[in-house]
Amino acid sequence: MAHFMKLLVTIALTTVVTIAIVTTKTTTKTATFALEDPFKDLTPPGTIKIRPSRFLAEKVDKGKEPKARNPNAADHCNKDNEICSSSDYSTGANATMACCNNKCMDLSTDDKNCGLCKNKCKFGQTCCRGQCVYVAYDKRHCGECNHRCDLGEFCVYGLCNYA
């Protein structure tokens, strides 16, 4: 009896699949949305197509405020620290901006120019206040810069009093 039921289910499924395939093949219409001329320029006549560079896009229009500066554009300081200290990067009297490799860099936080130009922090170290420190084990910079552990606590794996 079980063998007969398996045969009956198999025949029913085969019939359903066959009917589905036949109906989809006969009722499907292929619609194409191709243009008559795919290379035809669809811009209105008389318009000038110009793609300006990012430097031209920063140009100030007459009677308007200057556009926002492109954040990807490099500041070329050409070994002149005054450009970096007087620029928009400066954050007050204790600003630590300097010209490193023809770019303005913050010597207090940059891992590749920590304290001095081209002073790279080692693996696992972070530049905090111009010094390379291991934030995983430093009590004064536990887990992040300027996160001090309380008196008597140790910094382990970047957490004060771990375990």
UniProtKB/Swiss-Prot annotation:
The keyword Signal applies. The keyword Signal applies. It holds the Pfam family Stig1. Residues 1-20 form the signal peptide. Keywords: Signal. InterPro entries: Stig-like. Belongs to the STIG1 family. This is Stigma-specific STIG1-like protein 2. It comes from Arabidopsis thaliana.
